[in-house]
Curated annotation (Swiss-Prot):
Required for accurate and efficient protein synthesis under certain stress conditions. May act as a fidelity factor of the translation reaction, by catalyzing a one-codon backward translocation of tRNAs on improperly translocated ribosomes. Back-translocation proceeds from a post-translocation (POST) complex to a pre-translocation (PRE) complex, thus giving elongation factor G a second chance to translocate the tRNAs correctly. Binds to ribosomes in a GTP-dependent manner. This is Elongation factor 4. PROSITE patterns: G_TR_1, G_TR_2. One of its GO terms (biological process) is positive regulation of translation. It catalyses: GTP + H2O = GDP + phosphate + H(+). It comes from Nitrobacter hamburgensis (strain DSM 10229 / NCIMB 13809 / X14). HAMAP family: LepA. The keyword Nucleotide-binding applies. It is a peripheral membrane protein. GO terms for molecular function: GTP binding; GTPase activity; guanosine tetraphosphate binding; ribosome binding; translation elongation factor activity. It holds the Pfam family GTP_EFTU_D2.
């Protein structure tokens, strides 16, 4: 490619290929991205040495082997037909919680490489992401990875791709991303089998905001896909969703190193910076246009990310509250889908009520807070958004059981339901179905693909957020995979269960549960609390109650001083008098004594499977 072209940053649109890699967690997506970068010279072998998953920039992404933020890289490739091509590779997350990151990355591309592990076969999240790619009219090239493993069964997996997804896999590319085997064939398949983007260079600027993140030096960096027109340095742009205008300071792309250019043309993917203060000002999926002659219609199909799961996060040490507030603010800079507001709890002090996209999102935020900011946190039981109709005709939404109005004021409570797709080897099907049944699920369909079963279930989200994923993995020995999407709200017989310690309700342990499961959950929680609350000088009753009705109770026995030790022989009334006096003292203590509940008791009670 000529220096002139490289400087301008624009390329003939027919020589551009925008594609994403779609795969289930751990099927080798980021490793394949590494090989593509290496073989096209994006980074030298020396720079790649000792580095795996170049595009996974967070430590936690590398450690868990998952991709959280969508990443992009631009590669130059000299094809066998003698032409120079530009590849824009979008590395997307594979986990269900980050499905919105996937959807907008896919909207910026025309094709996808579907990477399937030849030893594992198609998994539930592969399905979800492929369907999203097909919804975006993507051309799909199947790639079978890990074909060098002894357990690989490429022919069986090809058949499975055709049966489950319904796309022709006869000419799937066979590779081993780890060793680089077959990767040159992938590069050629991108050129020959994926379509170039469409776009008009002379039209008014129209660009899709794909992602944004905060950089300490540059402020907010915005990842864009140019649809029509040209994005130039020093031009003035407008975000159509927020109606805010900015002056573009830098324009460029990643190779994965940052390269600045003067302009980006139609079909290209790159970044801009424009003195934007907060990531919250850049809505993902928004349309960017020219401020001087704006277009009227936004690009279709994007909605803001809405939190689905909520929980309270409290610092173990109350002095860490300000540090936690600052840390959350910093994480929110890079993650607009994470929301939080302050809350107080009588048991845990000051903390925050946080909203997440799902359980993995919650876990990752929690882990980042403890790892990057060295914070020790307690998380309360995760809950979902409930809709309540009141007797006076009003409607409210709550996600914190503490905010629930008096029972007499509530006409009905509705909870969110999901449709779950579970793929499991048929040996474990029985225990998977039993688990879904226990969680109030209703089966929609059951089909077999080879030796694996695909089950669709309707389940209440409330039953899934708690520990469903862990239980599913344990009943299937880790082989089942799971994907879900929200469907609608259904009215349910839900009750607010409280845990009382020494007659006092512990607000952090309140939860909304289905009436049929309340007793089991309550009993399990009080038994756990009994094990972990140390004995005091007086006995402590631990109760689980619904309204005024106690449904389970355990008692922590009192420590007792032997007050009669000094009485040798003598009259029995002397002993009795001392024992009566002790009894009086205990009674008084129980009335005014404060019970110290250790942090472990909270954490263990919340993890109980009732």
């Amino acid at each position: 490619m000529s220096d002139e072209l490289r400087k301008r940053g624009t390329t003939p649109i027919a020589n551009i290929r925008n594609f994403s890699i779609v795969a289930h967690i751990d099927h080798g997506k980021s490793t394949l991205a590494d090989r593509l970068i290496q073989m096209t010279g994006g980074l030298s072998d020396r720079e790649m040495a000792g580095k795996e998953q170049v595009l996974d920039s967070m430590d936690i992404e590398r450690e868990r082997g998952i991709t959280i933020k969508a990443q992009t890289v631009r590669l130059n490739y000299h094809a066998k037909d003698g032409k120079d091509y530009i590849f824009n590779l979008m590395d997307t997350p594979g986990h269900v919680d980050f499905a919105y990151e996937v959807s907008r990355s896919l909207a910026a591309c025309e094709g996808s490489l579907l990477v399937v592990d030849a030893s594992q076969g198609v998994e539930a999240q592969t399905l979800a992401n492929v369907y999203q790619a097909l919804d975006n009219n993507h051309e799909i090239v199947p790639v079978l990875n890990k074909v060098d493993l002894p357990a690989a069964e490429p022919d069986k997996v090809k058949q499975q791709i055709e049966d489950v997804i319904g796309i022709d896999a006869s000419d799937a590319v066979m590779i081993s991303a780890k060793t680089g085997l077959g990767v040159p064939d992938v590069l050629e398949a991108i050129v020959t089998r994926l379509p170039p983007p469409q776009g008009d260079r002379d039209a008014t600027l129209k660009a899709l905001l794909v992602d944004s993140w905060y950089d300490v030096y540059l402020g907010v960096v915005v990842l864009v896909r140019i649809v029509d027109g040209v994005m130039k340095k020093n031009s003035r742009i407008r975000m159509m969703g927020t109606n805010a205008a900015y002056d573009v300071e830098r324009v460029g792309f990643f190779t994965p190193k940052m390269q600045q250019v003067d302009e980006l043309g139609p079909g290209e993917i790159g970044f801009i910076t424009a003195a934007i203060k907060e990531v919250a000002d850049t809505r993902v999926g928004d349309t960017i246009t020219d401020d001087r002659k704006p277009i009227t219609e936004m690009l279709p199909g994007f909605k803001p990310a809405i939190p689905v799961v909520f929980c309270g996060l409290f610092p173990v040490d109350a002095d860490d509250f300000e540090t936690l507030r600052t840390a959350m603010g910093k994480l929110r800079l890079n993650d607009a889908s994470f929301s939080f507001e302050m809350e107080t709890s009588a048991a845990l002090g000051f903390g925050f009520r946080c909203g997440f996209l799902g359980l993995l999102h919650l876990e990752i935020i929690q882990e980042r807070l403890s790892r990057e900011f060295d914070l020790n946190l307690i998380a309360t039981a995760p809950s979902v958004i409930y809709k309540m109709k009141l007797t006076d005709g009003g409607e409210i939404e709550i996600h914190n059981p503490i905010d629930m109005p008096d029972v007499v004021k509530i006409a009905e409570i509705a909870e969110p339901w999901i449709e779950a797709t579970i793929l499991t080897p048929d040996d474990y099907l029985g225990s998977v179905l039993k688990l879904c049944q226990e969680r109030r699920g209703s089966q929609k369909e059951l089909t077999y693909v080879g030796s694996r079963a695909m089950v669709r279930y309707d389940l209440p989200l409330n039953e899934v957020v708690f520990d469903f994923y862990d239980r599913l993995k344990s009943v299937s020995k880790g082989y089942a995979s799971f994907d879900y999407h929200l469907t609608d709200y259904k009215v349910a017989d839900l009750v607010k269960m409280q845990i009382l310690v020494n007659g006092e309700p512990v607000d952090a342990l309140s939860m909304l549960v289905h009436r049929t499961r309340a007793e089991g959950r309550g009993r399990a929680m009080v038994e756990k609390m009994k094990e972990l609350i140390p004995p005091h000088m007086f006995q402590i009753p631990i109760q689980a109650a619904i309204g005024g009705k106690v449904i389970a109770r355990e008692t922590v026995r009192a420590l007792r001083k032997d007050v009669t030790a000094k009485c040798y022989g003598g009259d029995i009334t002397r002993k009795r008098k001392l024992l009566e006096k002790q009894k009086e003292g205990k009674k008084k203590m129980r009335q005014f004594g404060k019970v110290d509940i250790p942090q472990e008791a909270f954490i263990a009670a919340l993890k109980v499977d009732g």
